[in-house]
């Protein structure tokens, strides 16, 4: 029986007792006792729904790994028929199979099986869609010309997201603040919810578009429109969850300010490429969300390597980025039916090797078990940490946040009456970007038995030490 205290993480030891009374630990696993998954979101994804997923055991095996990593919410990417008509078929008659935007086959039974399998494991299922997308046949489905946004005031050049010619269509953009469009897409979502047991809507946008205009020639305020759109979606389906992407932080304050999203989601790019930028985003989001909303990063690892070749993820780069994100109190959208390397979620250019898969289990055990120290409300602390030794031959240096190359970075905060000190190893780092674009980040140099001196306030009752590289 789980303890009664809500929103608490635990690390459980599985052990046996020897004849002499000593305990032998056989393994450890994290447990999250929380009544609402959005308090500590650990977000995953699925992105392929073709015939290969109908084979016995495929979906179950994929979801078993996500479950072992304590993933508690799953985003369904590129599952939909059309951006303006997401359901494959009609409310009254579902298509057995339909084509997604890239003309890949999507089987309705596969979508349904993913949802039911996730629900059986205690996960929530979120469907993905833009807030303002329509394909080139939208007029035949009832989308009106007056709802679009344009690149100029002459109604001649619709804003669009252009795609390869082999795909279904380019995506043409509508005004997210247009109330008729809101009512239209909310009804299409109602068709989805009536047929598929999704728990909510993962809303997407496309970042700063520059100056754009509505049908009447008025300049469009997209961030304000996003807030209006979120409000309309929540009003139509008050019991469904909402999350919206803030691409490069665009519209983040307006999204959070609605009070209608369940956590904050930032897709980060080259303009926010530094480890220090992740800290800036989390602190800004904490203010935008009135200290109540957690942050999930869609942060694509080894991006350039994935764009030019196939192979494996660079394990040290992935783990260093996760270590920083977790220390800062965030989580990382990266695990799904494969590991994420590009904004096109179905891309499988890079794969996890067995070492990285094992490390992911340890890291997610760590994030889950220690979620209260990592992700509960905190205040940054000015705790002085220094080397209590004169061994110059070890070539060690410590610095306070933000990170520096050739140093161990200290990030300290006060959480729940405890002082938490993170030691992040950048001793061998070849750059200070979380992206590890070409997969070149070296494994950190291992240092051990280093005496540290810490100046802390108050009486020290106990000191605990934990690391996902050793303990979880």
Q: Positions of the model-derived regions?
A:
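Beta-strand-enriched, solvent-exposed domains that form extended recognition/catalytic surfaces
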Residues: 1-36
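An acidic-aromatic substrate-binding cleft motif
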Residues: 24-82
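Active-site-adjacent "subsite" loops/lids of carbohydrate-active enzymes
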Residues: 35-56, 125-196
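Short, acidic/polar
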Residues: 51-68, 181-195, 247-255, 314-322
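Aromatic- and acidic-residue-enriched carbohydrate-binding clefts of CAZyme catalytic domains
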Residues: 80-111, 139-176, 207-224
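Active-site neighborhood of glycoside hydrolase catalytic domains
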Residues: 175-293
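Aromatic/acidic polysaccharide-binding cleft in carbohydrate-active enzymes
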Residues: 205, 291-382
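C-terminal beta-sandwich/jelly-roll accessory domains of carbohydrate-active enzymes
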Residues: 380-410, 414-472
């Amino acid at each position: 029986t789980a303890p009664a205290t809500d929103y608490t993480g635990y690390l459980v030891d599985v052990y046996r007792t020897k004849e002499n009374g000593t305990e032998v630990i056989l393994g450890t696993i994290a447990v999250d006792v929380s009544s609402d998954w959005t308090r500590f979101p650990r977000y995953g994804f699925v992105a392929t729904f073709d015939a290969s997923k109908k084979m016995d055991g495929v979906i179950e095996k994929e979801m078993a790994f996500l479950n072992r990593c304590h993933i508690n919410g799953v985003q369904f990417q590129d599952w939909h028929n059309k951006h303006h008509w997401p359901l494959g078929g009609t409310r009254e008659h579902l298509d057995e199979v339909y084509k997604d935007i890239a003309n890949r086959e999507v089987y309705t039974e596969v979508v349904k099986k993913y949802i039911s399998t996730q629900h059986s494991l205690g996960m929530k299922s979120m469907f993905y869609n833009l807030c303002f997308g329509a394909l080139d046949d939208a007029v035949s489905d009832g989308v009106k010309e007056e709802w679009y946004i344009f690149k100029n005031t002459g109604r001649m050049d619709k804003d669009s997201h252009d795609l390869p010619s082999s795909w279904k269509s380019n995506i043409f953009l509508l005004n997210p603040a247009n109330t008729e469009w809101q009512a239209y897409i909310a009804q299409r979502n109602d068709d989805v919810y009536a047929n598929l047991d999704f728990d909510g809507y993962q809303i997407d946008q496309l970042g700063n578009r520059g100056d754009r205009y509505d049908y009447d020639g008025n300049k469009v305020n997209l961030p304000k429109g996003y807030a209006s759109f979120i409000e309309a979606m929540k009003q139509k389906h008050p019991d469904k969850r909402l999350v919206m992407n803030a691409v490069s932080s665009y519209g983040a304050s307006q999204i959070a300010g609605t009070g209608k999203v369940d956590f904050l989601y930032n897709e980060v790019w080259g303009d926010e490429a530094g480890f220090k930028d992740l800290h800036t985003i989390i602190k800004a989001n904490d203010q935008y969300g009135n200290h109540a909303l957690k942050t999930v990063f869609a942060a694509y690892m080894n991006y350039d390597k994935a764009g030019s070749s196939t192979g494996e993820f660079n394990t040290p780069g992935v783990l260093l980025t996760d270590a920083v994100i977790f220390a800062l109190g965030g989580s990382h959208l990266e695990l799904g039916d494969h590991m994420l390397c590009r904004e096109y979620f179905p891309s499988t250019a890079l794969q996890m090797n067995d070492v990285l898969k094992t490390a992911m289990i340890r890291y997610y055990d760590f994030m889950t078990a220690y979620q209260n120290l990592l992700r509960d409300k905190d205040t940054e602390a000015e705790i002085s940490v220094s080397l209590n030794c004169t061994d110059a031959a070890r070539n060690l240096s410590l610095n306070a946040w933000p990170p520096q190359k050739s140093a161990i970075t200290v990030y300290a905060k006060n959480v729940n009456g405890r002082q938490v000190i993170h030691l992040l190893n950048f001793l061998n780092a070849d750059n200070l970007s979380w992206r590890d674009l070409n997969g070149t980040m070296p494994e950190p140099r291992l240092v051990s038995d280093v005496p540290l001196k810490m100046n802390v306030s108050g009486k020290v009752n106990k000191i605990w030490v934990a690391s996902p590289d050793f303990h979880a």
